[in-house]
Structures are given as structure tokens and as C-alpha cells.
């Protein structure tokens, strides 16, 4: 058994958690002077408190006084705290967690605020279903404030259904064209006399029919070359120089009459020659225009001093190879290009 001496008791002192300022002291050889500690645990708070408690004015002015920093290790680890915190307490460690907590508090406060609002409808809405025979309230009218979304962002994310209106399609009105007054003139001559045309014409954009009053009921024949059935070459196809429907004025363009009646399309190339037979009829009091086959004809309501034209028959024949096309096969490429250049400069292809 060892005897209890004041020196042994002083050497066996431990670190008191209540007093973080005291340092463990050991005495050797009966001396009471403190020796350099080997393992001293200090916190930043204990160093600052010990500096303030010291009554030495020089110690307080110089901050740490004459303390030898080499003898005291730096407190690199987290300060030791002996005050136990409750384990249930949760503190946000980042800015995003703090922001989430604040958003959650705002949502809870808005829900409480909405619960306190009155859920009853106004007098007008109640009167809407009060009279006998009134329709029952829909589910949309009976929705309470509590069932509505509390967060505005979630409500905006939902797609809103808009009423879909029926698209109206434009349909051109049906226009009745009555040309029955001209039927007696079509059967005026027997079939034997109506086999051959009165005269034949070669079509050009500047063709003008003479006044054929003596040939009413008969027909004329017009031959149209391939190049005049092209809207890029024939300027009259783009000017809508056509008056009437089925029965046209004599100053209407013949190529445009064929396109209006659907004999050929302006959107497709034509590779054959058109031979058109046209009835010669008396003038009408009124020529009504319509839109057919991407071409809109014009109307004419005043008096006309010419004749009327109506398509009898349209035949297509293949284009014969010209002398130029037959002789060009024996030429070289340079000679072909030169021949085409000279032909393009001639008056034949000028419009």
C-alpha cells in the first residue's frame, strides 16, 4: 500500500471538464514548480479565457503574455465540447438545405392560411342551383380550398386544356351556268356538213378571229404548238385573258380556254401538239366567270359585238421531228450549240 502524500495526490490530478483553464501539474523531487507537459489538450476557448483571467497588465496587453508557444501544441482538431446536445436536433449544413427548410415553412403557412378561408360560394353561385329544375352542381363547383394545390409551381406545371375550335374549310359556292339557249344553234346543220371545219388557224398569242356571223353553228380548227402550252413562254396564260365558262368570248385566249376546261395542266409539261375544234355561236347577254383547274375566268355583263366560242373536240398528236432536229445528230457538240444559238436569235422564237 502506498502512502497518500500531498505530492502523490497532486501528481494524480486529472483534467477537470468543468474547469478548462487548469492544466495538469506534476511535481518531481518535492518541488512545486510546473514542468513542461508532455500531452496537454487545450482548446481555443481555454486559451482565450486563461488570457483574460490573468490579472497581469502586461499579460493582457501583449495578448498571450510571456507564454511559450513551443510548449503548447496548436489546437488543429475541433474543439472538445463536453456539453451534450440533444441527438434529435438537426441543423442545415448547406445553403440548399436551409433554403429547403424555408420553402417548407412557407408551404405550411400557406396551407394554414387557406384552411382558414371560407369555402362557401357567393350568393349568386348558390342561387344558380336553387330554383327548381336547375342543374346539379358540378364537381368543379364543389372543390374546396383545401383540395387546391398549395404550391404555385406545381399548379403551373400542369397542362391546361384549351377549347379546340373547328377549322372551317373554304368551299367555293356552286355556280349554275345555263347555256341551254345555244343548243338550237349546235344542231342547226346536219352531221354531213359539220364534218369539216370552216377554216383552220395556226395559233399564236396574237391570234384574233374574224367576225364569222355567217358560220354560226359550224366550227373552226386551231392547231397549237407545244411551246405555246407552256406558261413560261406564252404570256397570255398568266394574264387570265378569258371571259366566261364553257362558252367564251371570241377575244379569249384559246390556250387558256383549254387549261380552264381541264384539257391540260399548267403544272405538268406538255409534249404533244393540240388540235382544237371550236363551235361558232352567237354572243350571250352575260358571261359568268368561275374558277376551274387553278384558273379563274372573268365575267362580262355588258353588250358584246363579237361571237362566242365553245370547245367541240380536242385531239393530241405527237410532234414530228423537224429538219433541224434530224440534221443536228450529225453535228458535233460545238456545232449544235452554235446552231441553237442562231435559232434562238431568229424571229421564229421571239414572243
Curated annotation (Swiss-Prot):
Transmembrane segments: none annotated. Gene3D superfamilies: LCCL-like domain (2.170.130.20). One of its GO terms (cellular component) is Rpd3L-Expanded complex. Residues 1-25 have a biased composition (Basic and acidic residues). Residues 26-41, 63-86, 107-122, 136-149 have a biased composition (Polar residues). Pfam families: Rxt3 (PF08642). InterPro entries: LCCL_sf, Rxt3. Residues 1-156 are annotated as: Disordered. Keywords: Chromatin regulator, Nucleus, Repressor, Transcription, Transcription regulation. One of its GO terms (biological process) is transcription initiation-coupled chromatin remodeling. Component of the RPD3C(L) histone deacetylase complex (HDAC) responsible for the deacetylation of lysine residues on the N-terminal part of the core histones (H2A, H2B, H3 and H4). Histone deacetylation gives a tag for epigenetic repression and plays an important role in transcriptional regulation, cell cycle progression and developmental events. Component of the RPD3C(L) complex. Belongs to the RXT3 family. This is Transcriptional regulatory protein rxt3. It comes from Schizosaccharomyces pombe (strain 972 / ATCC 24843). The gene is rxt3.
Amino acid at each position: 500500500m502506498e502512502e497518500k502524500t500531498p505530492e502523490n495526490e497532486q501528481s494524480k490530478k486529472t483534467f477537470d471538464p468543468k474547469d478548462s483553464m487548469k492544466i495538469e501539474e506534476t511535481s518531481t523531487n518535492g518541488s512545486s514548480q510546473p514542468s513542461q507537459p508532455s500531452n496537454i489538450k487545450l482548446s481555443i476557448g481555454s486559451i482565450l479565457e486563461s488570457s483574460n483571467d490573468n490579472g497581469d497588465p502586461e499579460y493582457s496587453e501583449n495578448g498571450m503574455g510571456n507564454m511559450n508557444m513551443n510548449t503548447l501544441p496548436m489546437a488543429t482538431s475541433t474543439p472538445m465540447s463536453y456539453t451534450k446536445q440533444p441527438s434529435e436536433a438537426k441543423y442545415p449544413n448547406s445553403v440548399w438545405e436551409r433554403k429547403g427548410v424555408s420553402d417548407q415553412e412557407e408551404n405550411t403557412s400557406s396551407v394554414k392560411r387557406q384552411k382558414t378561408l371560407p369555402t362557401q360560394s357567393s350568393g349568386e353561385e348558390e342561387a344558380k342551383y336553387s330554383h327548381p329544375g336547375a342543374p346539379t352542381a358540378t364537381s368543379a363547383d364543389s372543390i374546396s380550398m383545401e383540395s387546391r394545390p398549395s404550391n404555385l409551381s406545381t399548379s403551373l406545371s400542369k397542362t391546361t386544356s384549351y377549347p379546340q375550335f373547328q377549322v372551317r374549310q373554304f368551299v367555293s359556292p356552286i355556280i349554275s351556268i345555263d347555256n341551254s339557249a345555244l343548243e338550237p344553234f349546235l344542231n342547226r346543220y346536219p352531221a354531213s356538213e359539220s364534218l369539216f371545219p370552216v377554216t383552220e388557224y395556226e395559233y399564236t398569242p396574237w391570234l384574233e378571229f374574224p367576225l364569222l356571223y355567217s358560220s354560226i353553228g359550224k366550227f373552226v380548227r386551231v392547231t397549237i404548238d407545244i411551246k405555246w402550252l407552256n406558261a413560261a413562254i406564252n404570256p397570255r396564260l398568266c394574264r387570265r385573258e378569258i371571259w366566261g365558262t364553257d362558252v367564251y368570248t371570241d377575244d379569249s385566249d384559246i390556250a387558256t380556254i383549254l387549261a380552264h376546261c381541264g384539257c391540260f395542266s399548267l403544272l405538268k409539261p406538255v409534249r404533244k401538239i393540240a388540235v382544237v375544234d371550236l363551235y361558232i355561236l352567237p354572243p350571250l347577254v352575260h358571261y359568268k366567270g368561275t374558277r376551274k383547274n387553278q384558273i379563274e375566268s372573268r365575267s362580262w355583263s355588258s353588250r358584246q359585238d363579237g361571237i362566242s366560242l365553245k370547245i367541240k373536240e380536242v385531239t393530241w398528236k405527237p410532234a414530228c421531228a423537224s429538219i433541224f432536229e434530224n440534221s443536228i445528230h450529225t453535228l458535233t457538240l460545238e456545232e449544235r450549240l452554235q446552231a441553237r444559238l442562231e435559232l434562238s436569235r431568229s424571229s421564229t422564237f421571239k414572243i
